[in-house]
Design a protein with these regions (language model features):
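Generic hydrophobic alpha-helical segments
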Residues: 20, 24-28, 32, 96, ...
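Short, electropositive alpha-helical surface patch
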Residues: 51-56, 112-114
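Conserved acidic residues
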Residues: 35-36, 54, 105
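ATP-dependent small-molecule kinase phosphotransfer cores
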Residues: 1-48
Length: 134
C-alpha cells in the first residue's frame, strides 16, 4: 500500500516524491519476514537486507516504446531524459547484479501485452521452483 507518511519531500528536479527509506523498511520488515512478498521497487539500493529476496526481476523496455509510454504518462524534461538514460545504460540491471547474487537476477522485457503474459508465467515458474527447493 502506498502511504504518504513514507514521503520525505516532493518537488525535486524530477518532479517526483522521495521515499523515506527508513520508514518504508520499518513498515515492510515484519511483512517480509513472514515470506511470500512481492515488492515492486525502482531501485535495489533501497534494501540493505539482500537476504530478503529469493528472486529479483528487472523489467526492461525497448527505448522507443519506453519513450512513448513515458510521454503518454506526462513525463517531460529531465524526468523523461533520466528514465531513458537509465534504460539505455542498463542502470537498474547493473544495480541489481551488483546488489544481489547474480543467479537470482532475471532480466525480463515488457514491450508488448504478450510479453507481460509470458513474464507473469515465467515469474510464477521461477517462484514455484524456488518454493519447492526451500
Amino acid at each position: 500500500r502506498y502511504r504518504k507518511i513514507y514521503l520525505k519531500k516532493v518537488g525535486n528536479k524530477f518532479q517526483s516524491s522521495i521515499l523515506d527509506d527508513h520508514k518504508v523498511i520499518k513498515f515492510l520488515k515484519p511483512k517480509i519476514k513472514l515470506g511470500g512478498c512481492i515488492i515492486d521497487c525502482q531501485s535495489s539500493n533501497f534494501f540493505a537486507r539482500r537476504d530478503w529476496f529469493s528472486a529479483v526481476f528487472v523489467a526492461r523496455t525497448d527505448l522507443s516504446i519506453l519513450y512513448d509510454r513515458l510521454e503518454h504518462k506526462g513525463y517531460t524534461g529531465s524526468s523523461l531524459k533520466n528514465n531513458i538514460e537509465c534504460e539505455l545504460f542498463e542502470v537498474m540491471l547493473l544495480e541489481a547484479y551488483k546488489s544481489f547474487r547474480p543467479k537470482i537476477v532475471y532480466e525480463i522485457y515488457n514491450n508488448t501485452e504478450e510479453d507481460i503474459v509470458e513474464n507473469v508465467e515465467f515469474i510464477i515458474s521461477i517462484l514455484n521452483k524456488k518454493k519447492s527447493v526451500s
